[in-house]
């Protein structure tokens, strides 16, 4: 009986040892975390941007995914009631820094392609040409983002005080913001991104509610009245961030001035951002909603800007309008940046693949 039990135990021990050996072999065949291998495969877009660009088998879409991974900790910034204008500046600087990193990755691709090539022949390298063209666009965008990073101050986004008049933005900083936004849009258009259309909706929509008094939160000569912040919020619901951005960049730098007469359908976001007399600002029911909304966004983001508010904690309502306008504009700018980078990487990837694709013997 004891011999039989001993034999059974020995067989169990042998079986357990064999299972352990099999498990150890299996574990040894697994790729390490974060690495690719025959046993693991590679996820779409994995690898650094430079690696994806240099691998002929990877698509342009993979390159864009690698870029999105690079900027994933920066994209999607949203201003809140506690967000300072300079915090938004930090977001712009961070996004610009990521474009700088992408540019460095591109440079690495060019350097790798030039290994073993005489300097005199390097200028004829199609990969270097493709990289230089892409870097030029990315560096231009970075410059404009860096500029946007300096136009704010330590006050909250959409800054407002209870039962108080608003304050005009610093005109020099407003011009800087305008130039940067226009530069981003022009660069994007040069890279094949469609320019957004300016919204034509007026502050009075058809025969419906007239929200022209919403412009009074941009008054610099007196507090807003009851309901003005609500009408400003209603104006924002009628326009998109893209329409606001288009309205801003379709302005001209010389429009960064105080409004001294009644507004018209031609009054620009830059003028609304500087503001003026409340009666002048709210005089025309045909003022463009995108212009008023763009002005609110700029007032909320640029140094010195402050929104007017009524009493009874109306400053919270005015600030809420400013934050909404600012976030709409930020989303539009970020979207334009992403589309531009996507187009740039697609073009660069195509040229790089063409240069590295093996040619038939007769075409060597």
Swiss-Prot record:
<keyword id="KW-0732">Signal</keyword>
<feature type="signal peptide">
    <location>
        <begin position="1"/>
        <end position="26"/>
    </location>
</feature>
<keyword id="KW-0564">Palmitate</keyword>
<comment type="function">
    <text>The Vlp and Vsp proteins are antigenically distinct proteins, only one vlp or vsp gene is transcriptionally active at any one time. Switching between these genes is a mechanism of host immune response evasion.</text>
</comment>
<protein>
    <recommendedName>
        <fullName>Variable large protein 21</fullName>
    </recommendedName>
</protein>
<comment type="similarity">
    <text>Belongs to the variable large protein (Vlp) family. Alpha subfamily.</text>
</comment>
<keyword id="KW-0472">Membrane</keyword>
<dbReference type="Pfam" id="PF00921">
    <property type="entry name" value="Lipoprotein_2"/>
</dbReference>
<keyword id="KW-0998">Cell outer membrane</keyword>
<dbReference type="InterPro" id="IPR000680">
    <property type="entry name" value="Borrelia_lipo"/>
</dbReference>
<keyword id="KW-0449">Lipoprotein</keyword>
<feature type="lipid moiety-binding region" description="S-diacylglycerol cysteine">
    <location>
        <position position="27"/>
    </location>
</feature>
<dbReference type="GO" id="GO:0009279">
    <property type="term" value="C:cell outer membrane"/>
</dbReference>
<keyword id="KW-0614">Plasmid</keyword>
<feature type="lipid moiety-binding region" description="N-palmitoyl cysteine">
    <location>
        <position position="27"/>
    </location>
</feature>
